[in-house]
Design a protein with these regions (language model features):
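Macromolecular interaction modules
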Residues: 1-227
Length: 227
């Protein structure tokens, strides 16, 4: 499995240009080290919208889904630092999916990613997963592309956290998450319009109305980088 574990935390939000410099400093030098110090957090990656807009995409790769309800993680979620409390309100239109990894093929750290938020038609989850698993092997070998990863949200059985309270309990959720990785933006956009276009996904078993975006890698780290 190419992702570094059986689970992942995938998040999207908007960050204003005015808040972004401090956000990136905090995120790289306090937040990533804090999260990567939690047992089971294996890699953290932050991306910015490729079109220069306000969008941010962050993915944490986790040993397994139980990490999301672990005492060590909950302790951090319920005791955010003063700097974190100051930055949290700037995370606008947050979507936060706590996922099990369903399929993972090829590279997971690349200069560009296409993320797609989708859901299966009732009764067609198996069809959709099988079709995307088959496609993943072809995508990983195409010029400009290196990998395709499919995840499904499954909320852990935990109480609302202090971080959620600071954000106003307004987090959205993506049901299924598809992340295509590559080194060429045009190749990712072509993938988004063809093999992973809305018509193609509907034929595989997805509901209409997917959400998608292309992002550029800003920073990626593992626990070993924090030493």
């Amino acid at each position: 499995m190419s992702l570094l574990g059986k689970a992942a935390l995938a998040m999207w939000w908007d960050m204003s240009a005015q808040a972004r410099p401090e956000f990136e400093h905090w995120h790289a030098h306090e937040h990533f080290p804090e999260r990567l110090g939690i047992p089971g957090f294996r890699r953290a990656s932050r991306f910015a919208a490729a079109d220069g807009g306000e969008g941010v995409f962050v993915m944490y790769e986790l040993e397994d889904h139980a990490v999301l309800a672990s005492p060590a993680y909950l302790a951090r979620l319920n005791a955010p630092s003063p700097w974190s409390v100051r930055m949290m309100p700037h995370h606008r239109r947050m979507v936060r999916s706590q996922c099990r990894v369903l399929e993972s093929c090829g590279g997971a750290t690349a200069g560009q990613v296409l993320t797609i938020r989708l859901s299966p038609v009732a009764g067609r989850g198996h069809d959709l997963r099988a079709a995307l698993a088959s496609l993943a092997h072809r995508v990983a070998a195409q010029p400009g592309l290196v990998g395709l990863h499919l995840m499904r949200h499954e909320a852990p059985a935990i109480a609302p956290t202090e971080e959620q309270r600071v954000r106003g309990h307004s987090d959205g959720v993506a049901d299924w998450v598809l992340v295509a990785c590559g080194y060429d933006t045009a190749s990712l956009q072509a993938l988004s319009e063809a093999d992973l276009g809305d018509e193609a996904l509907a034929a595989m078993g997805a509901t209409p109305g997917t959400w998608r975006g292309v992002y550029t890698l800003g920073y990626s780290a593992t626990p070993q980088d924090m030493d």
